[in-house]
């Protein structure tokens, strides 16, 4: 799938939002990517998940896991594409855990997925969880990589599209300095 095609779908679905946003990473940005808009349409969920699954073709994958909330539907749909088990990790008292009877068995090959990667914080938490359970993380996949190539997961990282979007620390944010109201659209509680 070409970048222009992805951007056309994003535009059609209203994925790209402009304003002053507090990202899940804690950074500020003038752009927020609301990938949940993709997942409200099974057709587009399947398209993007299939694209991501193809990037890991040839890998033996037993489990696909994503962090709640952004990775839940993506993990399910990618798992469906590759014939694997789908799980999601969620925070309990600030720590990523498997709940609801989910388990990763020792030695299982695990693909970690997330809708958007900026700093990779949530993904790294899931990787640490999988490693603590003696799973074998074979890679990380996302629909959007907005890290500008700065994230290193120490396993292959592949995305459907890379979009560089400027992010700022709170103290350096020009939008804060202009007095533009801050919006927190993400799912993580601070």
UniProtKB/Swiss-Prot annotation:
Q: Which GO molecular function terms does the record list?
A: magnesium ion binding; orotate phosphoribosyltransferase activity
The text of the family note is:
Belongs to the purine/pyrimidine phosphoribosyltransferase family. PyrE subfamily.
Q: Which reaction does it catalyse?
A: orotidine 5'-phosphate + diphosphate = orotate + 5-phospho-alpha-D-ribose 1-diphosphate
**What PANTHER family does the database record attribute to this sequence?**
OROTATE PHOSPHORIBOSYLTRANSFERASE, URIDINE 5'-MONOPHOSPHATE SYNTHASE
Q: Where does orotate bind?
A: 118, 146
Q: Name one Pfam family in it.
A: Pribosyltran
Give the enzyme's main class according to its UniProt record, as a single word: transferase
Q: SUPFAM superfamilies of this UniProt entry?
A: PRTase-like
Q: What is this protein called?
A: Orotate phosphoribosyltransferase
User: What GO terms describe the biological role, i.e. biological process, of this protein?
Assistant: 'de novo' UMP biosynthetic process; pyrimidine nucleobase biosynthetic process
Per UniProt, where does 5-phospho-alpha-D-ribose 1-diphosphate bind? 114-122
**Assigned keywords, A-Z:** Glycosyltransferase, Magnesium, Pyrimidine biosynthesis, Transferase
Pathway this chain belongs to? Pyrimidine metabolism; UMP biosynthesis via de novo pathway; UMP from orotate: step 1/2
- Which cofactors does this gene product need? Mg(2+)
Q: What does this protein do?
A: Catalyzes the transfer of a ribosyl phosphate group from 5-phosphoribose 1-diphosphate to orotate, leading to the formation of orotidine monophosphate (OMP).
Which EC numbers characterise this protein's activity in its record? 2.4.2.10
* Quaternary structure (record): Homodimer.
CDD domains referenced in this protein's UniProt entry, alphabetically: PRTases_typeI
